[in-house]
Design a protein with these regions (language model features):
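Long, non-globular targeting/processing and low-complexity regions
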Residues: 2-207
């Protein structure tokens, strides 16, 4: 019974802005609370808030799969388009086939959108942890913007143009091989996520008028 409750539990997509730094002074904390109250009000009043607009892709790829799963779990029927057009009085077997196919379509649609989301995609970069460690070591040694690698000419030019030259961990020769492997894997993941997006959108285009119960 406990396993069933966990399976049927609705997944949430919070509109609240979380604490992002280790220390917040009272003014910063109060400002975050006030923004969160505004986001909650907007969600209740309009159905979406400013944070949803700022991350509309993430909102869509998180909310839609959850709604599809919930529809699939609680639905009471399926589209008549899944029945044989010549079959005006479908028997029990035909209804079971249609119901099973509709469940498969909803599950596939949810799966495609969930895989298209970089936060929930099951395809992971095997070099991600290693590259993160290299990046942190770079920041600690050369600064967040790699400012300790700037040449005298760059410093003078930055002052003259009022700009900041940024140096990255990928510029160091000892990191180049790992960076190439990391970016190659990211290209594969990006292509996979784009394919999943296209497949999910094609299913949504075909069945969007049937997403009700």
């Amino acid at each position: 019974m406990a396993a069933l409750k966990r399976k049927n539990k609705k997944r949430k997509y919070s509109c609240l802005e979380k604490k992002t730094v280790r220390f917040e002074n009272p003014v910063e904390k109060l400002g975050r609370w006030r923004r969160n109250l505004r986001y909650i009000y907007q969600r209740v009043r309009y159905g979406y808030c400013d944070r949803d607009i700022w991350m509309m892709d993430d909102w869509f790829l998180s909310i839609i799969p959850n709604m599809l799963d919930e529809l699939n779990r609680t639905r009471h029927g399926f589209p008549s388009a899944l029945l044989d057009k010549q079959d005006m009085n479908p028997d029990k077997e035909a209804n079971e086939r249609g119901d099973k196919e509709w469940g498969r379509i909803l599950s596939e649609m949810a799966h495609c959108f969930r895989e298209a989301n970089e936060r929930t995609c099951t395809l992971k970069n095997p070099y991600e942890d290693e590259w993160d460690n290299v990046s942190w070591e770079f920041y600690e040694r050369y600064g967040t913007l790699g400012e300790k690698l700037m040449t005298e000419e760059e410093i003078k030019e930055n002052k003259r143009m009022h700009v900041t030259t940024v140096h990255l961990a990928s510029e160091l020769p000892e990191n180049r091989e790992l960076w190439d492997k990391y970016t190659e894997e990211m290209k594969k993941i990006d292509e996979y996520q784009r394919t999943c997006t296209d497949q999910g959108m094609e299913l949504l285009r075909k069945w969007i008028r049937c997403l009700w119960d």
